[in-house]
Amino acid sequence: MTNIRKSHPLMKIVNHSLIDLPAPSNISAWWNFGSLLGLCLGIQIVTGLFLAMHYTSDTLTAFSSVTHICRDVNYGWIIRYLHANGASMFFICLFLHVGRGIYYGSYTYSETWNIGILLLFAVMATAFMGYVLPWGQMSFWGATVITNLLSAIPYIGTDLVQWIWGGFSVDKATLTRFFAFHFILPFIIAALVMVHLLFLHETGSNNPTGIISDADKIPFHPYYTIKDALGFLLLITLLLTLVLFSPDLLGDPDNYTPANPLSTPPHIKPEWYFLFAYAILRSIPNKLGGVLALVLSIAILAVMPLLHTSKQRSMAFRPISQCLFWILVADLFTLTWIGGQPVEHPFIIIGQLASFLYFFLILILMPTCSLIENKLLKW
């Protein structure tokens, strides 16, 4: 008799995706972040669902409903902080996952890569809208500043902003629709994840060497299920350590002050995971230019497959490219630091130089360097 997991229509799909899936024998811990992102999404959906049961999306009661969750709901505080810090974990895994894709040339699977970029945009939109919901000072002013950027779009900008706001300022209508979108987007993200995996399983996984590994495959279970389980354990340990020992470490103290449209905080800044993009936005004095740079800072990932000039796929055997990659990582850390600083000397010029270097590295230096390495192969 055939095993049920190989014959049952539904079990068969799970079997081909998670059990009998042929996987390269040499994929390192950098390949763990895909499953960790799945775990993060699961944690966010479950904790978010429980928070939504007690949250009210009204400007008068939103802030106090979050306080009520933390004080009066059974284990409400841990659910709230798991959700808030779970978002940080989500972005740490996302950045490492994308970084792995760049380093090992996984972007050559262009369909999987492009769905991944869509996922990144969707997760960023979800996180932004979620940050508005507690209706603290930084929630309100963050929403005002970021949505106002759309007014830089010629001709339709002002109308577009008022349409998104549902009025002439960020108010009750804005909060209600942000809650609606924040609730629905994770399920859209889950659907996109399915498509992401569908395209990935069409080609199979890349590996650290960047060489086709069809001749040497191993079953996903038990080898990579146990490896993923270890990753899950480490992620949950890190998340719980953060939640139980310093839950507000990554938050902004301003968000413990209820939103006040009449008082602007001294430094308006987003959550830490948006600071690099915020620094790029601020580095350009022109409003429209800044908005374009902000969008391009993520959209630039889409041109990576087109800019791949190397004869080798992975950077594993390309020391000059490796050097440029780590300069790019250091540059992103610099941008993140600058994004959290006030707009004054010397931070302005450092931000402008770091923003220039970010685009210069990806668009010019890395492809040129790959061509030089191609020449060196012939020596």
UniProtKB/Swiss-Prot annotation:
Heme b b562 binds at residues 83, 182. It is found in: Mitochondrion inner membrane. One of its GO terms (molecular function) is metal ion binding. Keywords: Electron transport, Heme, Iron, Membrane, Metal-binding, Mitochondrion, Mitochondrion inner membrane, Respiratory chain, Transmembrane, Transmembrane helix, Transport, Ubiquinone. Binds 2 heme b groups non-covalently. Pfam families: Cytochrom_B_C (PF00032), Cytochrome_B (PF00033). Its cofactor is heme b. It comes from the Eukaryota. A ubiquinone binds at residue 201. One of its GO terms (biological process) is mitochondrial electron transport, ubiquinol to cytochrome c. One of its GO terms (cellular component) is mitochondrial inner membrane. Heme b b566 binds at residues 97, 196. Heme 1 (or BL or b562) is low-potential and absorbs at about 562 nm, and heme 2 (or BH or b566) is high-potential and absorbs at about 566 nm. The cytochrome bc1 complex contains 11 subunits: 3 respiratory subunits (MT-CYB, CYC1 and UQCRFS1), 2 core proteins (UQCRC1 and UQCRC2) and 6 low-molecular weight proteins (UQCRH/QCR6, UQCRB/QCR7, UQCRQ/QCR8, UQCR10/QCR9, UQCR11/QCR10 and a cleavage product of UQCRFS1). This cytochrome bc1 complex then forms a dimer. Component of the ubiquinol-cytochrome c reductase complex (complex III or cytochrome b-c1 complex) that is part of the mitochondrial respiratory chain. The b-c1 complex mediates electron transfer from ubiquinol to cytochrome c. Contributes to the generation of a proton gradient across the mitochondrial membrane that is then used for ATP synthesis. This is Cytochrome b. The lineage of its organism: Eukaryota, Metazoa, Chordata, Craniata, Vertebrata.
